[in-house]
């Protein structure tokens, strides 16, 4: 566990202005870009290009927490992992969707416990500590893998209310699962959502 002074020092590199132009990217001294929160989504976008080039008609590609649904119009059924279960194969709900990308970020994947406190891997850039938004997972659906991956992480940190304008801005929809097992589904995604497991409450 880092000391408070180490966390404060690391925060000095957040909110730094990164300059992007046609020649490349300029990163301020002492700042490091970590693309870990979008790598799986980018992989989905790259795979889609390969599928298109190979003239594949239909595919489901899972890259960890991101899924590419690729096809010719027929819908797919995707399970959303139960964030309270130890089993990664156990879902609590399902979505019926056309071709798109689906990404989930949650506090249940990578964490450690110390002194009775659970520390997960999704950090709040304002505090340097694990985000405390009342959420246990966020699943984002949109056309772009990179965007779905980035938004699922951002929405987890922001929390439900602050995420709504961001989702609207990028034309994305989401499923929010709270610590008390309540669930909120945004926009038209509600028509594609179905609870499968007892104990969860759709608000």
Language-model region placement:
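Mature catalytic core of soluble alpha/beta enzymes
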Residues: 1-203
